[in-house]
């Protein structure tokens, strides 16, 4: 039970974020290695000032992706252009970037706006410029025109970022996703807040406020529900809550531990940790019927289950080998296999969306870091350089990991790219935040 106590202590350490303000994202490493891209401020074709500059949102998204580095707009050779017809390829000859994003915004009826954007292949443009005048339309990698309402500027900015990211990398963008996390503001009557926000910290929404701890939020595959652990009734219970209707369902309230929920790929079941029969073991609960099926059966602690993408197996953390390590269990055969061997401890594993890697917490020399292991080669790479890292959650496109950590004595969220090169911190004002969970594609 000492090991479980340490795990629970680690889980309760991470509590950081503001309720009334967006989480900022401060990039700490990896900018120099990113791919340069030019984003020209979108042209406003209306009276006064534009309601919001969409290009700022696109620049922020691409910067936070860890893949791209938007150039300083002051260094761009052209401004006030919105289409390839105005693009002077010769002027861009010495600009070290692979593509240019440009566009325009103009009023289009009451509280509506017509947004146009184009993605230009700058490498090809520079090559063609050496050959003399060419047909500029061949340089357009993508072009879109959309009518949006006044409250959709941020959303459509993220949509443009998704399109640009996928066009240039072949990987689906994740800028329209959200994160869930638990905020604690000590001194309040109900200090524990279950929150969701856009991936970049904007548009925060409180789902639940409680005088007792809330823990371990996790998203359903359709992005409509969250499962989480609540102590509001003075004991651990697992609830599932619809984020749109706010309807809550009590799924598990057995004696002892009810913890670590994880949705199955079809959204119909939860893998959980229960101690109703003695030691903490892994169970699978049918959400509709509440029936619980025991999966592991060992005298050691088994906890932190998560699903393989095919829904046929689970990962879980167990000390059955003497120290916490990650194991897998096949749901049909019950066969258990050890997955991790390097490091002192390995905890909280989850399989990446492509099924090729596992993200987890690795303890080596007494330090907790986020790590990645290639499931085919078993190569282990420590990704983070922060301390007391916990609760890693992978973006649905598999490119980034968000997790909890500490910075200057305060518990914060952080992010790291899947190759470990790009790192960012999400500082907040008052309060603490823990247990980040990245949504699926929405």
Swiss-Prot record:
GO BP annotations, alphabetical order:
cell division; protein import
Keywords noted in UniProt: Cell cycle, Cell division, Periplasm, Signal
Chief location of this protein within or outside the cell: periplasm
- A Pfam family for this UniProt protein? PD40
Q: Which InterPro entries match?
A: 6-blade_b-propeller_TolB-like, PD40, Tol-Pal_TolB, TolB_N
The cellular component terms of Gene Ontology attached to this UniProt record, alphabetical and capped at eight, are: periplasmic space
Cellular localization per UniProt: Periplasm
Kindly indicate where the leader peptide sits in this chain.
1-21
Record note on quaternary structure = The Tol-Pal system is composed of five core proteins: the inner membrane proteins TolA, TolQ and TolR, the periplasmic protein TolB and the outer membrane protein Pal. They form a network linking the inner and outer membranes and the peptidoglycan layer.
Report the sequence similarity comment from the record.
Belongs to the TolB family.
Under PANTHER family, the record lists: PROTEIN TOLB (PTHR36842:SF1), PROTEIN TOLB HOMOLOG (PTHR36842)
The task this protein performs is described as: Part of the Tol-Pal system, which plays a role in outer membrane invagination during cell division and is important for maintaining outer membrane integrity.
Name listed for the protein in its UniProt record: Tol-Pal system protein TolB
Say which species the protein is native to.
Shewanella denitrificans (strain OS217 / ATCC BAA-1090 / DSM 15013)
The primary gene name is tolB
């Amino acid at each position: 039970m000492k090991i479980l106590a340490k795990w629970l202590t680690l889980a309760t350490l991470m509590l950081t974020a503001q309720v009334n303000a967006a989480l900022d994202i401060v990039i700490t490493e990896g900018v120099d290695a990113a791919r340069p891209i030019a984003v020209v401020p979108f042209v406003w074709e209306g009276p006064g000032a534009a309601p919001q500059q969409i290009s700022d949102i696109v620049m922020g998204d691409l910067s936070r992706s860890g893949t791209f580095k938007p150039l300083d707009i002051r260094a761009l050779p052209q401004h006030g252009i919105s289409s390839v017809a105005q693009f002077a390829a010769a002027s861009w000859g010495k600009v070290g970037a692979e593509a240019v994003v440009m566009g325009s915004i103009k009023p289009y009826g009451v509280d509506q706006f017509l947004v146009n954007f184009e993605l230009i292949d700058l490498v090809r443009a520079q090559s063609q410029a050496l050959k003399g005048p060419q047909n500029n339309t061949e340089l357009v990698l993508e072009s879109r025109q959309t009518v949006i309402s006044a409250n959709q500027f941020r959303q459509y900015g993220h949509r443009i970022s998704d399109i640009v990211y996928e066009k240039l990398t072949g990987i689906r963008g994740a800028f329209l996703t959200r994160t869930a996390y638990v905020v604690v503001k000590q001194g309040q009557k109900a200090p524990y807040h279950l929150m969701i926000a856009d991936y970049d910290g904007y548009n925060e929404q409180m789902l639940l406020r409680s005088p007792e701890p809330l823990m371990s939020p996790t998203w359903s595959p359709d992005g409509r529900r969250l499962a989480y652990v609540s102590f509001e009734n003075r004991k651990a219970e697992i609830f599932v809550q619809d984020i749109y209707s706010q309807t809550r369902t009590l799924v598990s309230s057995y004696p002892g531990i009810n913890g670590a929920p994880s949705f199955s790929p079809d959204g119909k079941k939860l893998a959980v940790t229960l101690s109703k029969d003695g030691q903490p073991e892994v169970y699978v609960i049918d959400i509709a019927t509440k029936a619980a099926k025991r999966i592991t059966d060992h005298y050691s602690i088994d906890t932190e289950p998560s699903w393989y993408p095919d829904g046929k197996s689970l990962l879980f953390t167990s000390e059955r080998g003497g120290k916490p390590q990650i194991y897998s269990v096949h749901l049909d055969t019950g066969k258990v296999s050890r997955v991790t061997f390097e490091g002192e401890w390995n905890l909280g594993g989850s399989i990446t969306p492509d099924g090729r890697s596992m993200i987890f917490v690795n303890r080596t020399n007494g330090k907790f870091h986020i790590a990645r292991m290639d499931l085919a080669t078993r190569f282990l790479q420590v990704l983070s350089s922060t301390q007391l890292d916990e609760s890693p959650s992978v973006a649905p496109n598999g490119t980034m990991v968000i997790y909890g950590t500490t910075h200057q004595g305060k518990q914060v969220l952080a992010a790291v790219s899947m190759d470990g090169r790009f790192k960012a911190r999400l500082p907040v004002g008052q309060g603490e935040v823990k247990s980040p969970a990245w949504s699926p594609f929405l």
